[in-house]
Amino acid sequence: MHFATLASGSSGNSVLVGEGDRNFLIDCGITAKRLLANLRMLNVSPSKIEGIIITHEHSDHIRGVGVLARKLKIPVYATAPLWQEIDPILGELDESQKIVIEDFARLAGLDIKLVPTSHDCRASYGLKVFGLKHTLGIA
């Protein structure tokens, strides 16, 4: 399993996680343009991004989600309470791109467990990602 922090801090957050050449993003709180530039620096093709999973609705975690999902034609994964908050913010997405998850998801061949966390928002989650040989926790 591999991961890379693409952005961190109050100006935006995003993490790339993957196994082999399959990848997904945790959040996209930076512009799609900046995120794509960061992927290029890592030699990761945007075509290898299979989706975006959202941890919570703050703008520094979702700022670029809508544009990136439309541009790459990839799904966005979020819990029902999160979709209620982010749907009006993300802009027009095809219904097939809006994936509602509960406490578990499978993305880019990896199993992902959502763990509720305490934060100053309606719904917030940490993630436990299970790879072939390693497990990654992100909160």
For each feature predicted by the language model, list its residue ranges:
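A generic structural signal for short beta-strands and their flanking turns/coil linkers
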Residues: N13, R22, K48-E50, R70-L72, ...
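Structured catalytic core of nucleotide-sugar glycosyltransferases
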Residues: A4-V15, H56-H61, V76, W83, ...
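Active-site metal-binding motif and surrounding structural segment of the metallo-beta-lactamase
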Residues: A32-A78
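Metallo-beta-lactamase
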Residues: A80-K133
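Noncatalytic linker/hinge segments flanking ATPase motor cores
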Residues: S10, P46, G64-K71, E92-K98, ...
